[in-house]
Amino acid sequence: MARIAGVNIPVHKHAWVALTSIYGVGRTRAKAICDEAGVPRDRKVKELTEQELEAIRTALGKYEVEGDLRRAVAMDIKRLMDLGCYRGIRHRRGLPVRGQRTQTNARTRKGPRRGPAGK
């Protein structure tokens, strides 16, 4: 398996599809990275030369991906929570942040139902 950005990417897939297995790289960015590195999109990862892999690593180095991106997102959410703004409070309480209704639905964000207290 080829290792790019600390992730083992699948070797039997096309280069651009395999790049999407990296956190922070979607379809558009994966295609842009392949174009920037000069790698044909339809070439399988196992067919890539070491120079092409290095070119992909260099092109990918310009973006914030994997651990750095996860850390940045976590810090952004923590900053909102520390500020005490509306979005931060919603994060803190585990409720939907973007204005969705909560009287019904919102089960994904709120977690499983709590039943009645019993006797």
Curated annotation (Swiss-Prot):
Note down the stretches annotated as region Disordered. Answer: 94-119
- Please, which domain of life does this record's source organism belong to? Bacteria
GO MF term set: rRNA binding; structural constituent of ribosome; tRNA binding
Q: Does the keyword Ribonucleoprotein apply?
A: yes
Indicate whether Membrane appears among the record's keywords.
Answer: no
Q: Name one GO cellular component term.
A: cytosol
**Xref: InterPro entries:** Rbsml_uS13_C, Ribosomal_uS13, Ribosomal_uS13-like_H2TH, Ribosomal_uS13_bac-type, Ribosomal_uS13_CS
| A GO biological-process term | translation
| Keyword tags | Ribonucleoprotein, Ribosomal protein, RNA-binding, rRNA-binding, tRNA-binding
Quaternary assembly: Part of the 30S ribosomal subunit. Forms a loose heterodimer with protein S19. Forms two bridges to the 50S subunit in the 70S ribosome.
Family recorded in the similarity comment: Belongs to the universal ribosomal protein uS13 family.
Q: What does this protein do?
A: Located at the top of the head of the 30S subunit, it contacts several helices of the 16S rRNA. In the 70S ribosome it contacts the 23S rRNA (bridge B1a) and protein L5 of the 50S subunit (bridge B1b), connecting the 2 subunits; these bridges are implicated in subunit movement. Contacts the tRNAs in the A and P-sites.
Put simply, this protein is called Small ribosomal subunit protein uS13
